Amino acid sequence: MPQKTKQTPMMEQYMQIKKQYPDAFLFYRLGDFYEMFYDDAIKGSQILELTLTQRNKKAVDPIPMCGVPHHAAQNYIDILVDKGYKVAICEQVEDPKQAKGMVKREVIQLVTPGTIIDESAGEAKENNYLTALHFENDQYGFAYVDLSTGELKVSVLNTIDTILNELISLRTKEIVVDSSVNDDVLNQIKNLKILISEQNDTEDSSEVSFASQDVENSVEVEVIKHLITYLKITQKRALSHLQRAVHYEPSQYLKMDYHAKRNLELLRNLRTQKKSGTLLWLLDSTKTAMGGRLLKQWIDRPLINLKEIEARQSMVENLLTHYFERSGLQEELVNVYDLERLAGKVAFGSVNGRDLIQLRTSLEHIPQIRYIIQELNDDGTFDEIFDKLDPIEDIADLIEQAIEDEPPISVTDGNLIKPGYSQELDEYVDAMKNGKAWLAELEAKERQATGINNLKIGFNRVFGYYIEVSKGNLSKLPEDRYQRKQTLTNAERFITPELKEKESLILGAESKAKELEYKIFTGIRDQIKDEIQRIQELAGAVAALDVLQSFATVSEQGHFVKPELTTDNHSLDIKDGWHPVVEKVMGKQSYIPNDIKMDDDLDVLLITGPNMSGKSTYMRQLALTVVIAQIGCFVPAKSAKMPIFDQIFTRIGAADDLISGESTFMVEMKETNVALMNATRNSLLLFDEIGRGTATYDGMALAQAIIEYVHNNIHAKTLFSTHYHELTILDESLDKLQNVHVGAIEKNGELIFLHKMQEGPADKSYGIHVAKLAGMPDKLLKRADSILNKLESENDFTVDSTESYAEEKHIEEKNENETSEIQEEQLSLFQPEAVSLDSNQSKILKEIKNANLMGMTPMDVMNIVFKWQKELNKKG
């Protein structure tokens, strides 16, 4: 059997480094390429569509390999990281010319999904958050950081659901955990397709001390330690741009879980998963990348503190009413680059000359921005922002004096530093540019000094520069200055101290100039690094101004109005409100506004009307108006008086939960239960067609029970749309419920949607008319109409509005009889002939007959219906 080929020293070095990074692709620098070997090469060639070749092809065991050019490596790294992989970048860390034996190589950075900072990897207005989780004393410490900007937030979370909602909201791609986090939590995180990286060891460092100095809770300090330790291990450099950790409480903001944010399409379009057609798309007239990122954060976390909301409103109103100042501000903001990420590049040492010119350009526009805000700040509205508008003139002046206006991308190829900044560098540059002139001047000078007219200065690769004198003139040379260098047949070649100095200067000028320029550049970079906190503070102020001017611009263009918000009562009064995204897509002339009025004596609007008439749009319209108001923007209405809401819960649309494998109905019940268990009087509930995922009467019973529970126990403002017209009679027993419907009329057999909300219940659903609009065959529609008439004549089920939780004990027997009759009616409706039931079905039927639906809580009903469905679906 042939023996395996002995590894070369280079491959031994590769294997030693690879052992340290078993879970990452190792990009091993070899000349002008990054090479991958063995399994990395096989897998990498497939993912990156590279040619798989072999090293030592003639050996018994050739090594699979593939590679990418070093100058194009970032694109390939981005692809791997975007697919959830890690990439270890291994560089030559010594000059091959000076290496004794094998060139030393080290991993200089581990790029992961949560730490990628290259701009090409994502949009400028997107954050890339790395999160961390640590469990201690029955609490979860949770932290997240954007490595490109230095933003660092920390909190204490008490439930797994809250953790999952935060992870989804942050769109995190990677989370750092330690052994304190149990498998149940890890499995639920894995279901979100998030890369889990384990970091058990921690270290105290200057970065940890700085980041946690305002943090008091020990579990928060500990999670910061794990997070920063992981960053230092992966990035292998100082993290001087990390900001002080800011503690936040999810309860400080309007709470919306993942389902609510998804259903309301705040940041992502449900259909396309893109920005277009979302609230973010509507409100984004920001001019800077950092403003765009901050806008997303504000939309994701609306305020609940009235004073904070009013402070934003005042600034928006000020900007809105001063058009010329706002226009001037926008013109300045357009010229401000991404200060946050420029600061990050400075800290990482990846900043180049062009980045510094962007920084200088940005800083040069701050004085005018400051002047505009000062003009608007007579009443002190902008005091907090104004104080942070620091032009950082010392840094702007430094860059202006030192860096060329159009520098190259590379920081090692020269042409970075302006003439006059460094005398030594100027001499090198002069030597490069004027070497021939110097030599000509020296030649003339030596001829004059020696009286030798045919004396000449020459150059060859072996001896360098020399002075050549014919043998007949040797006696004219001074003895002390000329040193013999080479003897020819008819001449001698010499060098003088001055020529030797010029030779050294000329020959080394280019390389020395590049070295000196890089040294000067790194010195400038280090000076700027000392001012990173000032740059970050300025960036925050500019970003806030950008979002506020965006609100003012959108409010002006959309004719939005300043809402009156209060914590004194629970009344809601919106006149001629509209869904701003739909209106922008359709055009103002095509969209019909609607009022929403719910005073302290009205908690539930029961909405009926045809499909496609606008019930869901009306509900989303209210929720979006609340979000827009509580981020400090004006709202789409003619007038609006609103309370401050603490939470928004939605149950809109039908979608199976593919991650957990649960049905539409089960998802519906779970989402509904989250609302029922967590809502307060100050919450907003939006329920669309609750109960449609199960049998008709089961659904109707659930819907009625949920409405009554909300009305009698929670007292939250609730919009509940339904096709169960039988429920409209509930307004007789529930004094804080009102029926409304979306108007529609039949004309010449056609259905016309009025899209106007009207008082009272709808007379019917017009389902067959909607099917006609969808283009279903006439024959099918006629058959459906015939069946509908038959069903309506045979069934006369109505809700007994006198039944309520307060009277349940007196009507248990009646409920049992009605439940039995309803079940029999359902069986006769869909199975007119006798049906033979197995023992399991008979058992369930008996349970259904005996179930006291009106004596159960909504959650009890959900659980028992789910149990029945599960048992009936079992294959016997």
UniProtKB/Swiss-Prot annotation:
GO CC annotation, single: cytosol
Molecular function, one GO term: ATP-dependent DNA damage sensor activity
Region (Disordered), start-end ranges: 801-825
Residue numbers binding ATP: 609-616
Any one Gene Ontology BP term: mismatch repair
Keyword annotations: ATP-binding, DNA damage, DNA repair, DNA-binding, Nucleotide-binding
InterPro entries: DNA_mismatch_repair_MutS, DNA_mismatch_repair_MutS-lik_N, DNA_mismatch_repair_MutS/MSH, DNA_mismatch_repair_MutS_C, DNA_mismatch_repair_MutS_clamp, DNA_mismatch_repair_MutS_core, DNA_mismatch_repair_MutS_N, DNA_mismatch_repair_MutS_sf
Composition bias type Basic and acidic residues, residue spans: 806-817
Family: Belongs to the DNA mismatch repair MutS family.
Purpose: This protein is involved in the repair of mismatches in DNA. It is possible that it carries out the mismatch recognition step. This protein has a weak ATPase activity.
Name this protein carries in UniProt: DNA mismatch repair protein MutS
Organism, scientific name: Ligilactobacillus salivarius (strain UCC118) (Lactobacillus salivarius)
